[in-house]
């Protein structure tokens, strides 16, 4: 959101949405839908996103009252002890009905169709993972008749987007309830999404602005003199979610960079043969200059007591940066800090960002130096 705020300030007043194609997964799906529904006025859309995220509290996203948390804990305990024979199996650890209510009040889905008809938007896609089919499904709505696509374990499906698609995309496994769409249950779009850039590419994007949520500096490895303690359930769950959300993007960017290098190596006057239907795609990547887990740790005390107790119960690292914490922390002090961080990082590259958004000539790949070095290396 901070990056979008910076771009809104850089663009002239009254500028419509600069992104013809918008694609998002998980929390990015929420931002994508808001941008698409307010595509006529980009500054207004960015301001609306900032207003909502800056005012977030955990109870706006999931129920945090003691009674609900007690019922959920007891339900899980009974299900484990009796194998689901008493009271049925729990659907999730937390209930995110408040988020559904918040989105239903703030997002007008019919405005997406209007934006498409008026030419303010070309297409918008929201990705979710199907549990029955074991596929990553990009639900998209487009101005023109875009062909649906089918690849190994991933498809693109044309539809009229609604709240269920967004709630499915944010349904973090085990934490939030899964959502049924057309007879199949769907969960967080990051699952099975090995190619997160794919929806934008299939929908015709020639430039892709990627807003990452973590830098790729490696965590320090433990040594024999200071070995790690045995990982708790919370640490393992946090690691699984961290992998789920982080790893696909950089692998996909590496593939895209290699394809670009291959296409750029062919002289324009020569036949590209089997690659004739492919096109190079400019990419700009903006990532946080600070580890969000470290930022989250500074605001651990902002969590409601019931959620802090839950984290302690599952061993979610009472001290030190926690992967699981950053997935549950939706308090305004933390989200405001994230907005400020994104804004600062975007303004550091404001000239390149503005050029990228307005169609000016840009490098094929713009990213932090250490990422650019890795992506540009063909050494594997």
Question: Predicted segment positions?
Answer:
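C-terminal helical/tail subdomains of lipid-metabolizing enzymes
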Residues: 90, 103, 263-380
């Amino acid at each position: 959101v901070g990056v979008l705020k910076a771009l809104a300030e850089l663009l002239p007043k009254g500028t419509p949405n600069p992104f013809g194609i918008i694609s998002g997964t998980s929390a990015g799906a929420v931002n994508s839908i808001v941008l698409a529904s307010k595509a006529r006025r980009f500054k207004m859309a960015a301001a609306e996103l900032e207003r909502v995220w800056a005012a977030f509290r955990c109870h706006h996203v999931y129920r945090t009252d003691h009674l609900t948390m007690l019922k959920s804990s007891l339900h899980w305990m009974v299900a484990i002890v009796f194998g689901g024979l008493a009271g049925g199996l729990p659907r999730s650890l937390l209930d995110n009905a408040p988020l559904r209510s918040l989105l239903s009040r703030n997002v007008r889905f019919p405005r997406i169709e209007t934006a498409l008809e008026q030419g303010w938007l070309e297409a918008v896609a929201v990705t979710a993972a199907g549990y029955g089919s074991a596929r990553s499904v990009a639900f998209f709505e487009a101005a023109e008749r875009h062909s649906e696509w089918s690849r190994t374990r991933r498809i693109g499906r044309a539809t009229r987007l609604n709240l269920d698609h967004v709630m499915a995309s944010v349904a973090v496994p085990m934490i939030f309830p899964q959502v049924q769409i057309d007879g199949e249950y769907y969960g967080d779009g990051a699952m099975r999404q090995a190619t997160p850039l794919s929806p934008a590419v299939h929908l015709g994007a020639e430039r892709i602005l990627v807003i990452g949520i973590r830098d790729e500096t490696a965590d320090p490895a433990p040594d024999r003199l200071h070995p790690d303690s045995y990982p708790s359930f919370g640490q393992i769950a946090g690691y699984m979610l961290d992998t789920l959300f982080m790893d696909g993007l950089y692998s996909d960017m590496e593939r895209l960079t290699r394809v670009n290098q291959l296409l750029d190596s062919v002289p324009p006057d020569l036949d590209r043969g089997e690659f004739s239907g492919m096109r190079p795609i400019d990419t700009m990547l903006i990532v946080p200059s600070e580890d969000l887990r470290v930022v989250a740790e500074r605001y651990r005390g902002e969590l409601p007591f019931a959620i802090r107790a839950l984290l302690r119960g599952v061993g979610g690292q009472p001290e030190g940066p926690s992967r699981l914490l950053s997935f549950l922390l939706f308090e305004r002090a933390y989200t405001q800090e994230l907005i400020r961080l994104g804004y600062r990082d975007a303004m550091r590259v404001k000239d390149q960002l503005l050029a990228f958004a307005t169609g000016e000539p840009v490098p094929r790949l713009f990213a932090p130096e250490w990422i650019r070095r890795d992506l540009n290396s063909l050494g594997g």
